[in-house]
């Protein structure tokens, strides 16, 4: 499969079909030059790649068990529930679940290989939920399970068709010396909410839960710890150095906010009214 995201043509050569199903909305069609387009990147996966992702997920689940309490909506907690279902299943169901698990972990391996290369195209992965309104993008970031997806859903409820989901989980951000653009990708969370678009990024908002809604603009220095935590950190040393350069650029390219919020639409009313100014 040849698909296009972040203005790059990417060919996937995989062992399972799962990742091709995931990326089909982003596939290059023949009438759009897909038949003759050259890939900017070719990604091949191996059994070792799948094993790495499975082992990593198991370590994360073990950490969650030891150092909870786990958030009921967190990725790790959902993984624990899936593992329990797998152990309790009959042999036929277990085989089907194993095939699903392999495919899902291979999809993670594919994206890892992609984002390892992206810093050399001035692009990084920042974990969060991104929504566009009137041609400007807003990214909400926080630890898993805090309510990022819920908050952008409230934006869509509030703003209707004006609000377009860019990516609900793992968007890519291209950063120049003075501006940032955010892209949809197929790796878009459990609800599969994304659009294959590029939108100027206006603001990044750090989200935390609270009973009462409040928002304030913060400095880039205050935002830095969560940026470092939620940005994908490449294993390759050169890519990691470039990622640090891109984070530094991002700190001067967009505005930063801290939002304490509940799950009422009034939270979206507040955040949109302040961040869109």
Regions found by a protein language model. Give the residues of each.
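A noncatalytic interaction/capping subdomain that flanks phosphate/NTP-handling catalytic cores
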Residues: 1-144, 154-164, 172-277
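Hydrophobic positions on the alpha1 helix immediately C-terminal to the Walker A/P-loop
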Residues: 151
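Conserved lysine of the Walker
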Residues: 148
């Amino acid at each position: 499969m040849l698909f296009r995201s972040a203005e790059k043509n990417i060919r996937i050569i995989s062992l399972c079909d799962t990742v091709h199903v995931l990326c089909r909305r982003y596939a290059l069609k023949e009438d759009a030059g897909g038949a003759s387009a050259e890939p900017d990147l070719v990604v091949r996966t191996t059994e070792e790649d799948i094993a790495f992702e499975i082992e990593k997920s198991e370590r994360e689940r073990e950490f969650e068990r030891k150092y909870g309490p786990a958030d009921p909506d967190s990725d790790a907690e959902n993984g624990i529930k899936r593992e329990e279902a797998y152990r309790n299943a009959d042999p036929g169901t277990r085989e089907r679940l194993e095939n699903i698990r392999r495919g899902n972990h291979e999809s993670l391996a594919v994206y890892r290989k992609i984002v390892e290369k992206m810093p050399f195209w001035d692009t990084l992965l920042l974990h969060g939920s991104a929504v566009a309104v009137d041609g400007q993008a807003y990214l909400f970031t926080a630890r898993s399970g805090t309510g990022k997806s819920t908050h952008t859903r409230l934006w869509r409820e509030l703003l209707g068709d004006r609000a377009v989901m860019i990516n609900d989980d793992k968007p890519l951000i291209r950063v120049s010396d003075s501006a940032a653009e955010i892209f949809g990708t197929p790796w878009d969370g459990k609800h599969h909410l994304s659009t294959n678009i590029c939108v100027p990024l206006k603001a990044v908002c750090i989200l935390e839960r609270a009973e009462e809604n409040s928002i304030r603009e913060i400095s880039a220095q205050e935002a830095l710890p969560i940026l470092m935590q939620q940005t994908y950190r490449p294993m390759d040393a050169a890519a990691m150095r470039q990622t640090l350069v891109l984070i530094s650029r991002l700190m001067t390219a967009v505005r930063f906010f801290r939002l304490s919020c509940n799950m009422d639409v009034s939270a979206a009313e507040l955040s949109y009214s302040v961040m869109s100014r």
